[in-house]
C-alpha cells in the first residue's frame, strides 16, 4: 500500500492506538509496523486470530502477560557461547514463567467453546524446557538477583556474611554507645571502601588503633576502622569475594544450560509477543466497539452503520456504504461541509483496517473485500482552495491512478475535477470516470458538479448518492443517501432565512423547466426514501427483539429441562437404591431360614410367620416401586424414535421428535421452539390418543402461562426446602413468560428463607441482579429480581 495513501486516510493514528494497548516492547514495535495485506488468505487468517483473542478477552479476560525485555540480544550472545549476566537470565526466567502462566490460562479454551485453531501454532510454541525452568526458578529472580537457593555453598556464604556483619555491628555499637563516645564527632557507624568505620575527632585518632580510611573536608574528622573490628572486616571482604566468585560460577552454569535451549527460548518469546500483539487487537476492538468484518472475494463492500473510528462516538453519524453490489461506481454530489469527505475517509480507513486484520467500526455482518491497492486523492473539504496549483496537484494524482488502476483496486477521489472552470471541470470529470470505469475498479467520488447527476443515471452499474440536509435546522445531518443525487437548497434556505417570497418565486421562475422538474423529483424521492428507511428500521428492531426473545426462551427451556432431568435421575437413583435394599433384606430372610434348615434345627412357627410377613411386605413395596412414575418412565425410555409424537413430561406439552442427538437424547419440536430432552422425559402418544393429549397439552400450556403472568411470589409461612423448590419453579416460569422483573416476598422472620433466596439468586445464571425492595414495598422483607 502507498504510504501517502495510508497517511491521508490516517491509518497511522489507528496503529498508534494499537501500539499503546500492547504490553511488551516487541509487541508495541510489531503494532507500529503493521501494514495492510493484499493477500486474501493472510487477511482472513489475521481476522480469525483477532476473533480468537476477542473471544478470550470476553470469556476469560486479558492474557496474564507482563512486560519483558527483548531477548534477541541475549540469544545472539548464547549463540557464540558467551555468558549472560543476571538481568539477562532473569529476563529469560520471566519469559518462561509467563509462557507457563499463559499456557495454563489457555488450557481450557476449547472446553469454553473457543475455537483456537487460528492460533494453534502459536500456542504450541509455549513449550517450557522444564529442567531450565527449574534451575532458573531455584537460582534467580526476575530482576537478575541470584537467590540464596542457587547453591548450598552460596547459601552458606551468605549466612556467614550475615553472621559476621552482625558481629561487626555489635562491636561498632559498643563504640557509639559506651565510654568512647567522647572521642567521636558523631555517634554513628558509616562505611568507607566497603568497610565499617567510626567518625573520630582528629585529636583522638590513636584511641582506637586500626586504619584511617578517609577524612572529612575540614580534616577535623577521620574515618577510622578500629583494630578490634579489623579482622572481622577482613573476613567480611573475603566472604564477599567468595560470594562473587560463586555467583559468577552459577551464572556460567545457567548460561551454558540456557544455550542448550536457544530455540525454545526464542519460540516462547515470539509466542508471547504474538499473543500480546493479538490481545492488543482485541482490546482495540473492544475500545472502539468494533466488529469482525465478513470477508468476500467478490470485491463487494456492504458496510452497515459504519463510523469513522477517529471521530468522537458521541458525535459521529453512522452510515450505510455499498459498492460492488448493484453498482461499482458511486457519485456523492451536493454542497461542501456536508460530510462527503468523511464518508470517503471512513470507507478507505475501514478497508485498510480490515486488510490489516483489525475489526471495524460498523454493525455486525458488515462485508468488506481485499483490494490489491487503494488509491485515494482526498483533501480537506473545509479548506480546498480552487487554484491552479491545487488543480495541477489534483490532476497529477489522478493521472498516476489512471496509469496503474486495475479491477482489483479501490479508487477514492474527493472533488473530482475541482479547481478549474466549472464547465471544463465537469467534462473532464466525466471523461476520467469513463476511463476508470473501463478498468472495472470500484470507485467512490465526491463532486459538486450538477452535470454528474445525469452521469449517475445514464451509466451502467453507477449510482448517485448525496449527504442529507435538514431544511428546518438549515444544517447537514451527515447521513448518506444512496440512490438520491444532491440538490441545491438555495431557494428553501433563502425562504427559511426570511427572504421576500416574491423574490424567491421570481428566482424559481428563472430556472428552466427541466431543472425545476429534476429538483422536485429529487425532493419526492428523498421523502419516499426516508419513509422507507424509517419503516425498515422499525421492522428490523421488531425482528431483532423477536430473535432475542426466542433465544431467551430457548435458553430458559433448555436450562429448565436440564434441571428436571437432574431431578429425574436423582429420583431414579433413589428408587434403585431402595429396591436394592429391599432385595438385600429378602435375601437375608431366606438365607437365615435356609441356614436353620441346614443346621437340622426346627424352624419355629412364629419365625416362619414373621418371615412370610416380611416377604409379603417387601413384595408390596416392590409393587409400589414398580408403579412408581419414575420407574414407569424408565421402562418407556427406549420406546420412542424420530417422527413420534410425544409428550414432554417436564413441560406438560406435546411435540414431535425431529432428531436423535445421542443415546437416550432427542431433539423435540414444540411449536416454534426446539428443545433437547432425554427419553426419560418423554412419553409416546398413540395416534388415537393424540387429540385428547394435545387438548390436555394446550390446557396445560394455558395454565402454565397463567402462573407465569404473576410478577410476585409469596414464600411466607413455607418451610425452607419447600420455599426454595417453589422459588426455583417460579423463576423458570417467569423466564418462559418473558418477565424481566419479579418480586420475591420472603418476610423478615429469622432470615433463613431470605438468606436462602439470595444464595439461590446469586448462583442462578439467569438472574442479572437483585436488591431489597423499597421501604414502601416491603423493604428487607422482599427482594426485587432482574432477569436476563
Swiss-Prot record:
ATP binds at residues 334-341. One of its GO terms (biological process) is rescue of stalled ribosome. Transmembrane segments: none annotated. Coiled coil: none annotated. Signal peptide: none annotated. Its EC number is 3.1.-.-, 3.6.4.-. GO terms for molecular function: ATP binding; ATP hydrolysis activity; ATP-dependent DNA damage sensor activity; endonuclease activity; mismatched DNA binding; ribosomal large subunit binding; rRNA binding. Belongs to the DNA mismatch repair MutS family. MutS2 subfamily. This is Endonuclease MutS2. It comes from Lactobacillus johnsonii (strain CNCM I-12250 / La1 / NCC 533).
Amino acid at each position: 500500500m502507498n504510504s501517502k495513501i495510508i497517511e491521508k486516510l490516517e491509518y497511522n493514528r489507528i496503529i498508534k492506538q494499537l501500539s499503546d494497548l500492547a504490553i511488551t516492547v516487541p509487541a508495541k514495535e510489531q503494532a507500529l509496523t503493521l501494514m495492510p495485506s493484499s493477500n486474501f488468505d493472510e487477511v482472513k487468517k489475521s481476522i480469525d486470530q483477532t476473533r480468537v483473542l476477542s473471544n478470550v478477552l470476553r470469556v476469560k479476560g486479558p492474557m496474564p502477560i507482563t512486560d519483558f525485555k527483548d531477548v534477541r540480544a541475549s540469544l545472539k550472545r548464547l549463540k557464540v557461547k558467551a555468558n549472560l549476566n543476571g538481568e539477562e537470565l532473569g529476563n529469560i526466567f520471566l519469559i518462561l514463567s509467563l509462557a507457563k502462566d499463559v499456557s495454563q490460562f489457555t488450557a481450557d479454551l476449547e472446553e469454553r467453546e473457543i475455537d483456537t485453531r487460528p492460533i494453534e501454532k502459536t500456542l504450541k510454541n509455549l513449550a517450557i524446557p522444564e529442567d531450565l525452568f527449574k534451575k532458573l526458578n531455584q537460582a534467580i529472580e526476575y530482576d537478575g538477583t541470584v537467590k540464596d537457593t542457587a547453591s548450598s555453598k552460596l547459601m552458606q556464604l551468605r549466612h556467614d556474611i550475615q553472621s559476621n556483619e552482625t558481629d561487626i555491628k555489635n562491636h561498632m555499637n559498643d563504640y557509639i554507645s559506651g565510654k568512647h563516645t567522647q572521642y567521636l564527632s558523631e555517634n554513628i557507624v558509616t562505611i568507607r571502601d566497603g568497610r565499617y568505620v567510626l567518625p573520630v575527632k582528629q585529636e583522638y585518632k590513636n584511641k582506637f588503633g586500626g586504619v584511617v580510611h578517609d577524612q572529612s573536608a575540614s580534616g577535623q574528622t577521620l574515618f577510622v576502622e578500629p583494630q578490634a573490628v579489623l579482622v572481622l572486616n577482613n573476613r567480611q571482604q573475603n566472604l564477599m569475594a567468595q560470594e562473587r566468585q560463586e555467583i559468577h560460577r552459577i551464572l556460567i552454569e545457567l548460561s551454558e544450560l540456557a544455550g542448550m535451549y536457544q530455540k525454545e527460548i526464542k519460540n516462547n518469546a515470539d509466542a508471547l509477543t504474538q499473543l500480546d500483539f493479538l490481545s492488543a487487537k482485541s482490546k482495540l476492538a473492544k475500545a472502539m466497539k468494533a466488529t469482525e468484518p465478513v470477508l468476500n472475494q467478490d470485491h463487494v463492500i456492504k458496510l452497515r452503520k459504519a463510523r469513522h473510528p477517529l471521530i468522537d462516538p458521541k458525535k459521529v453519524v453512522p452510515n450505510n456504504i455499498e459498492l460492488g453490489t448493484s453498482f461499482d461506481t458511486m457519485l456523492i454530489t451536493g454542497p461542501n461541509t456536508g460530510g462527503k469527505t468523511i464518508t470517503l475517509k471512513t470507507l478507505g480507513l475501514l478497508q485498510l483496517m480490515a486488510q490489516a486484520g483489525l475489526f471495524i467500526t460498523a454493525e455486525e455482518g458488515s462485508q468488506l473485500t481485499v483490494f490489491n491497492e487503494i488509491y485515494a486523492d482526498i483533501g480537506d473539504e473545509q479548506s480546498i482552495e480552487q487554484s491552479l496549483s491545487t488543480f495541477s496537484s489534483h490532476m497529477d494524482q489522478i493521472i498516476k491512478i489512471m496509469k496503474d488502476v486495475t479491477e482489483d483496486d479501490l479508487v477514492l477521489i474527493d472533488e473530482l475535477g475541482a479547481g478549474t472552470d466549472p464547465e471544463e471541470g465537469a467534462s473532464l470529470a466525466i471523461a476520467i470516470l469513463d476511463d476508470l470505469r473501463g478498468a472495472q475498479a470500484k470507485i467512490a467520488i465526491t463532486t459538486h458538479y450538477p452535470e454528474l447527476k445525469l452521469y449517475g443515471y445514464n451509466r451502467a452499474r453507477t449510482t448517485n448518492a448525496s449527504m442529507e440536509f435538514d431544511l428546518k435546522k438549515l444544517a447537514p445531518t451527515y447521513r448518506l443517501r444512496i440512490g438520491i443525487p444532491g440538490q441545491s437548497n438555495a431557494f428553501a434556505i433563502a425562504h427559511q432565512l426570511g427572504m421576500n417570497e416574491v423574490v424567491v418565486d421570481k428566482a424559481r421562475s428563472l430556472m428552466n423547466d427541466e431543472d425545476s422538474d429534476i429538483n422536485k423529483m429529487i425532493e419526492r424521492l428523498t421523502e419516499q426514501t426516508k419513509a422507507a428507511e424509517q419503516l425498515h428500521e422499525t421492522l428490523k428492531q421488531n425482528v431483532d427483539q423477536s430473535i432475542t426473545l426466542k433465544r431467551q426462551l430457548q435458553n430458559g427451556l433448555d436450562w429448565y429441562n436440564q434441571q428436571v432431568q437432574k431431578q429425574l435421575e436423582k429420583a431414579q437413583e433413589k428408587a434403585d437404591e431402595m429396591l436394592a435394599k429391599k432385595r438385600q433384606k429378602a435375601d437375608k430372610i431366606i438365607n437365615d431360614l435356609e441356614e436353620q434348615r441346614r443346621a437340622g434345627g426346627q424352624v419355629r412357627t412364629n419365625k416362619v410367620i414373621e418371615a412370610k410377613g416380611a416377604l409379603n411386605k417387601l413384595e408390596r413395596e416392590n409393587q409400589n416401586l414398580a408403579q412408581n412414575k419414575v420407574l414407569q418412565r424408565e421402562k418407556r425410555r427406549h420406546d420412542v424414535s424420530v417422527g413420534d409424537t410425544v409428550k414432554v413430561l417436564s413441560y406438560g406439552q406435546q411435540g414431535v421428535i425431529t432428531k436423535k442427538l445421542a443415546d437416550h437424547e432427542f431433539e423435540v419440536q414444540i411449536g416454534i421452539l426446539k428443545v433437547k430432552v432425554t427419553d426419560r422425559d418423554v412419553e409416546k402418544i398413540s395416534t388415537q390418543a393424540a387429540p385428547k393429549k394435545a387438548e390436555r397439552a394446550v390446557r396445560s400450556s394455558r395454565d402454565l402461562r397463567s402462573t407465569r403472568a404473576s410478577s410476585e411470589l409469596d414464600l411466607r409461612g413455607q418451610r425452607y426446602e419447600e420455599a426454595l423448590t417453589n422459588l426455583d419453579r417460579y423463576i423458570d416460569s417467569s423466564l418462559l413468560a418473558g418477565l424481566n422483573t419479579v418480586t420475591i416476598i420472603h418476610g423478615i422472620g429469622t432470615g433463613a428463607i431470605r438468606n436462602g433466596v439470595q444464595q439461590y439468586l446469586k448462583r442462578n445464571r439467569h438472574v442479572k441482579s437483585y436488591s431489597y425492595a423499597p421501604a414502601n414495598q416491603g423493604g428487607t422483607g422482599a427482594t426485587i429480581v432482574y432477569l436476563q
